[in-house]
């Protein structure tokens, strides 16, 4: 998503992005010889089976004999193919190819202008994706974003590096190139390099990066995502780690865009902006600019394709994770997403007015890009609360860190019955949580463990919104309370609040009303009077 539009002629004139100086510069075997942790070495050994002869390719070759491959396509002209061949990104086959690649270019907008990046998509991806053979499983693990944020919180500065055309630096063993054929009108080529469009490519690239950045210097954090590397710590320690990393890169032929060590206290990394002094994070300027564009786009009130909406929602959800935006505030926008997401990419949608209002508000908050605390230290639990609901009331138990216990049992009010369908646990359980928190949690509490036997609400809390309106209301209430709530599931038979919700609201009964049924949450089931009146989305 960008704010610039280009004519068809401008796109046609955009040059192919090729860096011949980096092609096949890396020696992957040398990476195995580097000093590194056992975990890094094990990950690297697993990844290298995709670029060296291994049982993986015997399994692929066996499946190629019966697998119905898609038709392959190519969008490069003869002059462009010659450029790719001269840059050693294509080579002549030594044996006839057994599988083919799609070959095309994607547009990239850079400061110097529009350019086209050549992409090769091996059709053996389909075999890997559909195979039940465990040999063909692909596992890629990136540095968790929360680990990066914690490192910024605990450190003085950072230094980052970026490999130049990283995939082009990684050679494919000659015996494997027959699985990566490129068919043209004038002849046949094969790929001598790791293809960016190959399903296991990120696993290979990430494992190689992890191996090289494993400098083993105390008090230094290192993180990476494919070709981007970050070191944080004290100035002296980061300088030492960066120097070692540069030397290790040179020793295996890995080319960096720059070998200059720049120690910074504020910088962008993987879409977020970090400040070591203020200890804050926000969106990078590039991502914030995209949020501005999304805001202006939404204000135009034009019909949008599924592809455009997916891009907008992806950006807004990313911003929510960075800026701690409460997604539950935008319940109807999220319901709309669950409706359109599976429709064809080119289908046009008219965004309902209430959904558009929420999306504009969301994009406005994202574009303001107000910094938030980069990381929050774990604090001691002040209270543990158990909640439960029945058709006639709710109950809760609060246990303080000092061990004092407070029990509460209340019937539903007339207003509760008027506002919510309390015969459904999907509405009753979240309402019980809201009432229990309001009654039992002081505003001074910093952290609360909240147990419920309503498992669907636990899933909703992990996503920060619930498909049921009652879930989103409860999550928004908890987010605005100023306390950190950890939502945990407890089986109903072990929930001590169960008897408090059921046993005291039916005179003459020792057992109380029956347990509430767990109502399905779906497009045709509504759990409050308000949601029912609004009608089904779409």
Whereabouts are the PLM-identified features?
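Reverse-transcribing Pol proteins
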Residues: 3, 7-137, 224, 323-357
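Reverse-transcriptase-like RNA-dependent polymerase core
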Residues: 21-62, 106-119, 164-189, 204-214, ...
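Catalytic-core region of right-hand nucleic acid polymerases
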Residues: 68-206, 248, 285-334
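Catalytic palm subdomain of template-directed nucleic-acid polymerases
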Residues: 126-136, 169-171, 217-252, 273-282, ...
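A short, polar/acidic, helix/strand-boundary loop motif
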Residues: 186-211, 297, 400-431, 439, ...
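Active-site palm subdomain of RNA-directed nucleic acid polymerases
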Residues: 202-246, 258, 436-452
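C-terminal reverse transcriptase regions that engage the nucleic-acid substrate
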Residues: 263-374, 498
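RNase H catalytic domain
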Residues: 437-497, 502
């Amino acid at each position: 998503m960008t704010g610039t539009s280009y004519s068809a002629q401008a796109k046609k004139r955009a040059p192919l992005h090729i860096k011949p100086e980096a092609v096949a510069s890396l020696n992957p075997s040398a990476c195995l010889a580097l000093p590194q942790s056992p975990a890094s070495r094990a990950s690297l050994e697993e990844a290298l089976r995709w670029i060296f002869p291994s049982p993986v390719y015997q399994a692929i070759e066996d499946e190629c004999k019966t697998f119905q491959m898609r038709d392959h396509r190519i969008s490069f002209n003869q002059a462009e193919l010659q450029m790719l061949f001269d840059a050693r990104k294509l080579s002549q086959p030594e044996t006839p190819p057994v599988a083919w690649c799609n070959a095309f270019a994607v547009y990239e907008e850079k400061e110097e202008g529009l350019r086209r990046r050549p992409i090769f998509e091996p059709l053996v991806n389909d075999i890997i994706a559909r195979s039940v053979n465990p040999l063909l499983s692909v596992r890629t693990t990136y540095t968790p974003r929360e680990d990066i944020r914690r490192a910024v919180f605990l450190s003085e500065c950072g230094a980052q590096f970026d490999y130049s055309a990283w995939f082009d630096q990684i050679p494919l063993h000659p015996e494997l190139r027959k699985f990566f054929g490129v068919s043209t009108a004038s002849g046949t080529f094969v790929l001598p390099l790791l293809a960016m469009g190959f399903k296991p490519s990120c696993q290979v690239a990430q494992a190689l990066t992890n191996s090289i950045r494993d400098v083993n210097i105390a008090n230094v954090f290192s993180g990476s995502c494919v070709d981007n590397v970050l070191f944080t710590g004290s100035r002296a320690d980061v300088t030492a780690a960066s120097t070692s990393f540069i030397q290790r890169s040179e020793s295996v032929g890995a080319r960096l865009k720059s070998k200059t060590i720049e120690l910074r206290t504020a910088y962008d990394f993987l879409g977020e902006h970090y400040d070591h002094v203020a200890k804050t994070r926000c969106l990078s300027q590039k991502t914030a600019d995209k949020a501005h564009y999304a805001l202006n786009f939404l204000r135009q009130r034009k019909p949008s394709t599924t592809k455009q909406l997916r891009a907008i929602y992806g950006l807004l959800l990313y911003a929510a994770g960075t800026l701690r935006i409460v997604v539950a505030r935008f319940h109807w926008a999220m319901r709309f997403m669950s409706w359109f997401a599976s429709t064809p990419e080119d289908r046009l949608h008219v965004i309902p007015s209430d959904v558009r209002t929420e999306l504009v508000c969301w994009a406005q908050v994202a574009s303001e890009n107000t910094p938030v605390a980069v990381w929050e230290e774990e604090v001691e639990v002040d209270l543990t609360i158990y909640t439960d609901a029945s058709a006639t009331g709710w109950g809760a138990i609060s246990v303080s860190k000092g061990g004092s216990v407070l029990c509460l049992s209340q019937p539903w009010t007339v207003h509760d019955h008027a506002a919510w369908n309390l015969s459904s646990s999907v509405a009753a359980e979240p309402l019980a949580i809201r009432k229990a928190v309001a009654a039992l949690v002081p505003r001074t509490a910093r952290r609360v463990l909240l147990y419920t036997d309503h498992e669907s609400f636990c899933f909703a809390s992990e996503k920060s919104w619930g498909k049921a309106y009652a879930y989103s209301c409860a999550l928004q209430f908890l987010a605005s309370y100023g306390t950190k709530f950890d939502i945990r599931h407890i089986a109903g038979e072990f929930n001590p609040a169960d008897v408090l919700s059921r046993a005291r609201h039916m005179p003459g009964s020792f057992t109380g009303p029956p347990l509430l049924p767990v109502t399905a949450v779906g497009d045709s089931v509504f759990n409050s009077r308000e949601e029912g009146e609004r009608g089904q989305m779409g």
